[in-house]
From Swiss-Prot:
Subunit structure: Self-interacts. Interacts (via N-terminus) with ARC3 (via MORN domains). Binds (via N-terminus) to FTSZ2 proteins, FTSZ2-1 and FTSZ2-2. Recruited ARC3 to the middle of the plastid where subsequent complex made of CDP1/PARC6, ARC3 and FtsZ proteins can form; this complex enhances the dynamics of Z rings during chloroplast division. Interacts (via C-terminus) with PDV1 (via C-terminus). Interacts with MIND1.
Tissue distribution: Exclusively expressed in young green tissues such as young cotyledons, shoot apex, emerging leaves and budding inflorescence.
One of the GO BP terms on file: chloroplast organization
Record organism: Arabidopsis thaliana
Chloroplast in keyword set: yes
Protein name stated in the entry: Plastid division protein CDP1, chloroplastic
Compartments where found: Plastid, Chloroplast inner membrane
Keyword terms: Chloroplast, Coiled coil, Membrane, Plastid, Plastid inner membrane, Transit peptide, Transmembrane, Transmembrane helix
Any Gene Ontology CC annotation: chloroplast
Disruption phenotype: Defects of chloroplast and FtsZ filament morphology (e.g. long FtsZ filaments formed by multiple rings or spirals); elongated chloroplasts with multiple division sites. Aberrant stromule biogenesis in the leaf epidermis associated with giant and pleomorphic amoeboid chloroplasts, typically having one or more constrictions as well as one or more extremely long stromules. Reduced number of enlarged etioplasts in cotyledons associated with the formation of multiple FtsZ-rings.
Membrane topology of the entry: Single-pass membrane protein
InterPro entries documented for this protein: ARC6-like (IPR044685), ARC6-like_IMS (IPR025344)
Coiled-coil boundaries: 419-439, 762-782
């Protein structure tokens, strides 16, 4: 009695858990169907027999099935054929795989291994969610692959003769879901994602989108599991987020239990993923993820501090101490309204105070205190130091811990106490057991009590050295008081203020912070990458299909501006301006002011010259754009001389903000700092303290990042700028805000080359600072699928004037590209 083989659909195991964003070439055409039919049966003796028929022969024979019995071959009329469905379809697709890959065996596998693998796959049930058509396609494909490997050497290859197995494989479109199902089951996740993304670009994929998305979601789950196994939590989290986006993109997939399981897993993984992302190197590539992690940490803290909200974190002291240890001092200060929380903590009988002690223990709050002192001292920010003093007073009242020295030190910095008082408190601290408590918090060994106490030594060892952004700051108290400035709180010297990642708001007050109605994004949404692209990519010249496909991109910002941006950009005049800005983005022309004709120590200004050619790829100022027509547009713009006209630059600025802001300011200002330095060279100069000059430049860089950043703090420009520089930068920042775009800046390196102070007969005292800056930035525009990025190393000369209140303000600048 012969044994007939039927192969039911088999699943892939859902592993609830990689990142795979590859793209591969994918060929789809529609030749006449030429498929060989091959049927394999096994006799009672266990031997396999095969017979092949072409599709045309099957049609002539009336779709008859061969069956082997007793060594003879009999024809059974009107029996169903697994190839019958192919006759109705002439659309085929090429898969970049071999038959061996489809069943999960190596190319060296013997025939018995092939049969065993097929039998094992046959016994496995399909994953929940696949359609019946996908199950049938999987069965047909599985049997077809087995037959080809057993009886057709072209597909099996020959190891001895070094003949590779045939690839790619051409199959009907109806078999694609079955192929993806098999590939996912045998562990070919990356192939599933590559083939799935490529297939979605073709119109023929429309009937199979449900099964394609499901296969891709399961592949991402498998990748996530592999990432978790090697402790790559953030990669696994992002893979799960991708799987979630695939399932949410199709209504029929949203009903699966798999989606619920993924969402629950993401909630549980939010805390460890936050720690993992905070531990990433502080590079421009990781800046976006780090901002998301900080926003997620803020949201987790909000949930923990809220009496009504629930949170996944069980051991708060352990979690929060690890998180704080991975933050910069400025990030700690901007994370929460710490002084308000400290005041709430004083009322020991309140429910909020009790709940806060569970979430934020004394050790964490002490590190927060040191962070405030570090930021306040390094940036000479009296308001931040005053907050540190408030925290001291509240912790003394609520915890009963002796923090008299820290309080006295803050009073000394605020000129509310003497150095002698602070030094006396330090001596008392060194001589009692409280110093051991502090050292244990900081993870330091106890210092010998015989050493002479020093405020500067304590400041360096116990405060500044604890945070990466203040570690290199000088602990000199003399410098602090010599050039003391009272900057507003938002002038951080290490990095721009940390805003709410989604809503672009500053940290809220305590009442607002614990009010869940003020927060529309969960920690999971904060951690989800903003660049999750829709898996549905329309085919070329198929806008109609693109419009009908669902988008699964996960938005982070609710403030998506839809005020006819596309109408503006697609208008003729705006399009010309857009092309012009792209040319500027693409590293074209800066106004380099040539200094020549140096006679008797005088600098004479040269006419502004504009280069008519784009910079080469080796130029240090390199814009990265995803536009395929960038080079073509750039050449066209340069030939027409659009970038050579200052008025046109101003008009383009009103249309869109897309260029390195320093360069755009210089062009639109129509004035160079050289004109002022000309007169300065004739006057008596005296050196300016390098640290003070560096501090001023850093202050300006931070203000620039805030004014052109997501919060558009245009008002802050007037605190550091004056004259024409203020007008031009205000125009630029206001235009960016009006166009709903903003810049993200990362200052990588700053070096003051020279700094001088001179007397200006008209304006009083003025200064000239020449600095070398290394900077990276990203232009964020919600209307564009990709953000323009640049990396630049440039030398810049600033002219500053001293105001009546004793503060310096930048008036003019002259930027030069470094080759």
């Amino acid at each position: 009695m012969p044994v007939a083989y039927t192969f039911p659909v088999l699943p892939s195991s859902c592993l609830l858990c990689g990142i795979s964003n590859r793209s591969t070439s994918f060929v789809v055409d529609r030749p006449e169907l030429q498929i060989s039919g091959l049927l394999v049966v096994r006799s009672e003796s266990g031997e396999f027999f095969g017979s092949g028929l072409s599709l045309r022969r099957f049609q002539r024979e009336g779709r008859r099935r061969l069956n082997a019995a007793g060594g003879g071959i009999h024809v059974v009329d009107n029996a169903p054929s697994r190839t019958s469905s192919l006759a109705a379809s002439t659309s085929t697709i090429e898969l970049p795989v071999t038959c061996y890959q489809l069943i999960g065996v190596s190319e060296q596998a013997e025939k018995d291994e092939v049969v065993k693998s097929v039998i094992n796959l046959k016994k496995t049930d399909a994953e929940e969610g696949y359609t019946m058509e996908a199950a049938a396609a999987r069965q047909d494909l599985l049997m077809d692959v087995r037959d080809k490997l057993l009886f057709e050497s072209e597909y099996a290859g020959n190891l001895k003769e070094k003949i590779a197995p045939k690839s790619p494989l051409r199959i009907p479109w109806a078999w694609l879901p079955g192929a993806l199902c098999l590939l996912q089951e045998v562990g070919q996740e990356k192939l599933v994602l590559d083939i799935g993304r490529a297939a979605l670009r073709n119109l023929d994929s429309k009937p199979y989108i449900h099964d394609i998305f499901l296969s891709m979601a399961l592949a991402e789950c498998a990748i996530a599991k592999a990432a978790f196994e090697v402790n790559k939590v953030s990669q696994g989290f992002e893979a799960l987020a991708r799987a979630q986006s695939f399932l949410k993109s199709k209504v029929t997939l949203g009903k699966l239990a798999l989606l619920t399981q993924i969402e629950e897993s993401l909630e549980e993984l939010a805390p460890p993923c936050t720690l993992d992302l905070l531990g990433l190197p502080r590079t421009p590539e990781n800046a976006e993820r780090r901002r998301g992690a900080i926003a997620a940490l803020r949201e987790l803290l909000r949930q923990g501090l809220s009496v009504e909200a629930s949170c996944q974190i069980q051991d708060w002291p352990c979690f929060l101490s690890q998180a704080i240890s991975r933050l910069l001092a400025t990030e700690i200060v901007d994370l929460l309204p710490w002084d308000d929380l400290a005041i709430t903590r004083k009322n020991k009988k309140s429910l909020e105070s009790h709940n806060q002690r569970v979430v934020i223990d004394f050790n964490c709050f002490y590190m927060v205190l040191l962070g405030h002192i570090a930021v306040g001292f390094s940036g000479k920010q009296n308001e931040t130091i005053n907050k540190a003093k408030t925290i001291c007073e509240c912790l003394i009242a609520s915890e009963g811990v002796d923090l008299k020295f820290e309080e006295a030190f803050c009073s000394f910095l605020l000129k509310q106490g003497s150095e002698a008082e602070a030094l006396e408190k330090l001596k008392q601290l060194e001589s009692n057991s409280d110093s051991a408590v502090r050292n244990s918090i900081l993870g330091k060994e106890s210092r010998s009590t015989s050493a002479t106490p020093s405020l500067e030594a304590w400041l360096m060892e116990s405060v500044l050295a604890n945070f990466p952004d203040t570690r290199g700051c000088s602990p000199s108290l003399a410098n602090f008081f010599r050039a003391e400035k009272k900057y507003p709180e938002n002038k951080k010297m290490g990095s721009p203020s940390i805003m709410n990642h989604k809503t672009n708001q500053r940290p809220l007050s305590t009442t607002q912070f614990v009010n869940s109605s003020q927060h529309l994004y969960t920690a999971v949404e904060q951690l989800t990458p903003t660049d999750l692209q829709s898996p549905v990519v329309s085919a070329k010249n198929n806008d109609e299909t693109s419009a009908s496909m669902p988008s699964v991109q996960l938005k982070r910002n609710l403030g998506v501006h839809k005020n006819k941006i596309w109408d503006e950009w697609l208008s003729q005049s705006s399009l010309i301006g857009r092309v012009s800005v792209v040319a500027l983005l693409g590293c074209t022309v800066f106004f380099s002011l040539k200094l020549s004709g140096i006679r008797s120590g005088r600098l004479q200004s040269m006419p502004i010259s504009v280069s008519a050619r784009p910079h080469s790829e080796s130029d240090s100022f390199l814009w990265k754009t995803e536009s395929g027509n960038f080079r073509k547009n750039l050449d066209s713009v340069n030939r027409n001389g659009i970038v050579g006209n200052i008025k046109v630059l101003i008009d383009m600025l009103k249309m869109h903000c897309g260029e390195h802001p320093d360069a755009l300011y210089l062009k639109s200002s129509g004035q160079s700092a050289t004109s002022l330095s000309h007169s300065a060279s004739e006057l008596h100069k005296r050196p300016m303290d390098t640290e003070e000059a560096e501090e001023l430049v850093r202050q300006w860089e931070n203000v620039k990042a805030e004014a052109l950043g997501p919060t558009h703090q245009v008002y802050s420009l007037s605190e550091v700028l004056d004259e024409s520089m203020l007008v031009q930068w205000q125009t630029l920042a206001q235009t960016a805000e009006a166009k709903s775009c903003y810049w993200r800046f990362v200052l990588l390196h700053l070096e003051v080359l020279q700094a001088h102070i001179f007397e200006d007969g008209i304006a009083g005292e003025a200064a000239e600072i020449e600095a070398l800056l290394e900077e990276a930035a990203e232009l964020v525009d919600e209307s564009q699928p990709k953000n323009a990025k640049y990396y630049s190393t440039y030398k810049i000369r600033y002219i500053l004037k001293k105001q009546e209140d004793g503060l310096w303000k930048f008036c003019q600048s002259d930027i030069q590209i470094q080759k």
